Amino acid sequence: MHTSFRTLVAALLMGGSAMVMAANDGQSRVNELLSSAPEYRTTWAKVVKKEERLPDWVINLSGASEQQMTAATEDGDKYLVGPLCETADTCKSKRLIVAFSLDKEDAYAMLVEVPAGLPADKSPTRHATYRYLGKPDEGMQKLLNEELRKDPNWY
């Protein structure tokens, strides 16, 4: 009886840990992903492998990420989506919107660059260049753009 009690307690603890980990999936920041699971690293490496002239902060997902990633659904598939900036100070001019599938098999991103020093009265939307990574389809491009538009300073 004592052994079965220990087994039950161990099973409950392991199950509880799994639930906490699952609930914590949406609590990540983009700059924490590659160190959190090898699957993220492998998938992201495939995305950036054939891309030319990407900045190191994009290749390594090592920029500033003040916002937590959020869950989003595209075409029935669930993703973690969030922003990453080169630095907190350059976020208005250099940012990356990233989407990883929950199974960590697929990743997409949109690199957004606005000329530095753009006057405040100029719309960043009209002066930005957009570069998609990971060959996102039209629906995924829309999802990445929607995430960018959540920023109140993006107009």
Predicted regions and their residues:
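Short beta-strand segments that buttress and anchor functional surface loops
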Residues: V81-T87, L111
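C-terminal partner/receptor-binding element of secreted or periplasmic proteins
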Residues: N24-R41, A116-Y155
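Catalytic Cys-His active-site segments of thiol-dependent hydrolases/isopeptidases
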Residues: Y108-P115
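A short, structured loop/turn motif at beta-sheet edges
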Residues: A72-D75, A99-E105
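Short, surface-exposed coil-to-beta transition loops
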Residues: T90-I97
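N-terminal secretory signal peptides
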Residues: A23-P83, P152-Y155
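Bacterial N-terminal signal peptides that target proteins for export
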Residues: M1-V9
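N-terminal signal peptide c-region/cleavage motif recognized by signal peptidases
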Residues: S17-A18, A22
